[in-house]
């Protein structure tokens, strides 16, 4: 019969999750005992950096990635980075060591009290399995949920004495062999109606959000902008680090001001606002004003049902962003609308003494590979 440890690593292997980022302590060492030769462990010295590396790794690979943290202190240190991973829609699967089961009730040293509550509200799922035998299924649950739209971080608390427990091989294999797919396209009727609204608009504009990048839909968003001569703003204050449209493109307009009044003022000359891959909107600070000018309508495309439900105005299509844009492009032809004025691109940052951060980032941007995160 396999142990919990053996079944768990078989599960990770089946899901292609053979790179683990972590900063372990004593409660995590039993999990790492007999660490498989085909796995890599990327050690960090602070938990926020560890989760940040995993977040970037998930963005590059498009797959769920493992993070290994040390009970309550490690999870607490990582919370800011977990917030960013949530904003980036990154499928980060966090395992957190827990005290031995016989010691939890006494709240012995290193017990993670209320472990499930600690990471909320910045994870999609937090769980501590009731039995050692449930560990592989709990981890599979977390992995699949992290990977379903909208992707995001999850956490499983794992007691340190679970790993050598033997479990039923057949039941474990059923869990290991499962595959879950969650990409769903938009209702074709809604896509056709949206295409007609874009076609009929006199002066439409687009707002690009981070879910475009998360869905791998940059090319589709660029094609839509060029096919319909849409200027493209970046959604304001989304958190995280993803961009939905290249800042070097001539249709780029910049980043929307994040407050209610300024957003409405910025978009007032447009009769249709198409928001793709973003909430509507992450407003801040509190500068009142009309959400939209009279005569301006808004349509949102998002994979996140909560983003769609909480928007204060406009219509919403909840579906995979890439699939929806692909279907929308098939409904549209090259517009005769005039192209927006070309964006000249960012100006060169002047050298200062002391040196400023913008100059450093500009120099780094010129040197790093194009596929760097």
Residue spans for each PLM region:
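Structural signature of the thiamine diphosphate
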Residues: 1, 16-19, 59-94, 120-173, ...
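Active-site diphosphate/adenylate-binding microenvironment
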Residues: 5-18, 23-26, 31-33, 342-373
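Anionic-ligand anchoring segments at beta-strand to alpha-helix junctions in alpha/beta enzyme folds, i.e.
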Residues: 18-55, 97, 186-187, 195-273, ...
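Short glycine-rich anion-binding loops that position phosphate/pyrophosphate groups of nucleotides
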Residues: 26-27, 70-74, 98-100, 160-161, ...
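Short glycine-/acidic-enriched loop or helix-start segments at secondary-structure transitions
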Residues: 31-32, 53, 77-79, 104-105, ...
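Short, solvent-exposed amphipathic alpha-helical segments in soluble enzyme
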Residues: 36-37, 82-85, 143-145, 171-173, ...
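Glycine-rich, acidic loop regions that bind phosphate or pyrophosphate groups
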Residues: 96-138, 238-344
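Aromatic-enriched
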Residues: 160-189, 339
């Amino acid at each position: 019969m396999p142990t919990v440890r053996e079944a768990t690593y078989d599960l990770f292997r089946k899901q292609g999750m053979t790179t683990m980022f972590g900063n372990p302590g004593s409660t995590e060492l039993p999990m790492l005992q007999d660490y498989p030769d085909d796995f890599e462990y990327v050690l960090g010295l602070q938990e926020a950096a560890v989760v940040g590396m995993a977040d970037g790794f998930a963005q590059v690979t498009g797959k769920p990635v493992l993070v290994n943290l040390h009970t309550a202190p490690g999870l607490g240190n990582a919370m800011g980075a977990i917030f960013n991973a949530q904003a980036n829609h990154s499928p980060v699967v966090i395992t957190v060591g827990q005290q031995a089961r016989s010691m939890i009730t006494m709240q012995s040293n290193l017990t993670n009290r209320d472990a499930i509550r600690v990471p909320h509200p910045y994870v999609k799922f937090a769980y501590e399995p009731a039995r050692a035998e449930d560990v592989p299924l709990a981890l599979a649950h977390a992995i699949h949920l992290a990977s379903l739209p909208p992707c995001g971080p999850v956490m499983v608390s794992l007691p340190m004495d679970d790993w050598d427990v033997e479990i039923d091989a057949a039941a474990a294999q059923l869990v290991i062999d499962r595959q879950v797919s969650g990409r769903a396209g938009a209702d074709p009727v809604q896509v056709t109606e949206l295409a007609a609204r874009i076609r009929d608009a006199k002066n439409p504009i687009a707002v690009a959000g981070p879910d475009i990048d998360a869905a791998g839909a940059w090319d589709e968003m660029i094609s839509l902008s060029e096919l319909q001569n849409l200027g493209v703003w970046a959604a304001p204050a989304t958190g995280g680090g993803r961009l939905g449209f290249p800042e070097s493109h001539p249709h780029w307009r910049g980043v929307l001001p994040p407050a209610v009044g300024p957003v409405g003022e910025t978009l007032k000359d447009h009769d249709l606002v198409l928001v793709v891959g973003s909430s509507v909107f992450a407003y801040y600070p509190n500068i009142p004003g009309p959400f939209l000018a009279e005569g301006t309508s808004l349509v949102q495309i998002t994979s996140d049902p909560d983003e769609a439900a909480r928007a204060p105005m406009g219509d919403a299509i909840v579906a995979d962003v890439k699939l929806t844009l692909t279907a929308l492009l098939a409904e549209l032809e090259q517009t005769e609308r005039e192209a927006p004025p070309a964006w000249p691109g960012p100006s060169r940052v002047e050298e200062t003494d002391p040196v400023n951060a913008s100059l450093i980032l500009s120099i780094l941007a010129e040197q790093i590979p194009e596929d760097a995160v």
